[in-house]
């Protein structure tokens, strides 16, 4: 089962550049799927970095307020223990890879925690089966598509069996088909009762998965929506909030129109 997260009066700033987050208070229930969305630079990524403990320990920043995980202050949880509680999936999975081959990457966290050889093998094969990457365990990470790399990143996190998953724009480099396959993985994690926090611009693939959508602007949570409320927003309301449309059909129509009307900038003949 996932873990409850409580945030109280959280403010984050980076080196005198103003507050990136301002007085955020938020309750996330165990097993809830939360999507944080909003314009670039609004503070979504900073909020994920606080939840997973990267601020202030990896990213230098001044932090005030409190974050609790299952009632325990996050700052009192040692970094090695946080790594077992929170699994991370980033926009570019290559930024979190430490191995050259898939099996080694999935096993990396288990090895760090001193699991026995038998335990590592069991955890790797369970995670690979859950994420459906059994047939590429012996492949080089460098030979994989973005979609497959993202699967490996999730399998690597799942091998340790965390109760919380934090994902920062995980679909950014995926096409539509790969994005929906990624959504199936999130659905499986949700069914397992995991707590999932996703910072994301693309919303269409999360409409049937998210329990709540939080709109972040200028470091503050300004609006909160259920999926039904999100679907009911007009195009004008979506634009005012700085969001992308959650309607895939509208996205596809826009892409088709853009392709049909694009100006030719390079033409080669008889090369």
Language-model regions, residue ranges each:
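A short, flexible loop at the N-terminus of ABC-type nucleotide-binding domains that lies
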Residues: 1-7, 12-23, 55-60, 78
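Conserved ABC ATPase signature
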Residues: 140-144
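H-loop/switch region of ABC-family ATPase nucleotide-binding domains
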Residues: 200-201
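Conserved ABC ATPase "signature" region
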Residues: 118-136
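ABC ATPase NBD Q-loop/coupling interface
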Residues: 66-81
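Catalytic Walker B motif of ABC-type/P-loop ATPase nucleotide-binding domains
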Residues: 165-168
